[in-house]
A protein has these predicted regions:
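Glycine-enriched, solvent-exposed interface loops adjoining structured elements
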Residues: 1-153
């Protein structure tokens, strides 16, 4: 059975279930599978890259962000920013009186990254991260996981 798009996936699930009373909830099954994939799977097909100009203590994470792989300031790829916990971030700020300088560390906080030291000028940040799998629907009929590994669904 070839499964290459959302409709074929729904049809394959319906065939597997062999119960017409569950047809209406097949999209829910797919959504639950995607939630599990985003929570548990880390695969090269989920890797993404984003850039941003940073000039403040906090910077918003991409909306599809799951987990960092590597962050560095452009032009300094041999010196990636180091991921630290929020408690360690607080200790570093207190010890340095939060003097602005070139960022060396970052922490994850809700939908943002917190940088330390706070940037003293504009820096170009390059971020490699694991991205959420695009949600399948009638308008988004495929994604990298379905195309390359449909059995994960």
């Amino acid at each position: 059975v070839s499964i290459s798009n959302y409709t074929e996936l729904k049809d394959a699930i319906a065939d597997f279930l062999n119960r017409s009373d569950l047809t209406a909830v097949i999209p829910t099954f797919i959504s639950l599978a995607e939630a599990d994939i985003n929570r548990n799977l880390r695969h090269r097909l989920m890797e993404n890259r984003a850039t941003a100009t940073i000039n403040s203590r906090y910077s918003v994470l991409p909306t599809d962000f799951l987990e960092p792989i590597r962050l560095h300031l452009e032009g300094t790829s041999h010196n990636p920013l180091e991921l630290i916990g929020l408690f360690e971030m607080q200790k570093k700020r207190a010890a340095s009186q939060d003097v602005a300088n070139k960022p060396l560390f970052y922490a994850l906080t809700q939908s943002e990254i917190e940088l330390f030291p706070t940037p003293n000028v504009n820096y170009d940040l390059e971020m490699y991260y694991y991205a959420k799998v695009p949600t399948l629907s009638s308008s988004t009929t495929t994604n990298n996981i379905l195309t390359n590994h449909p059995d994960i669904y």
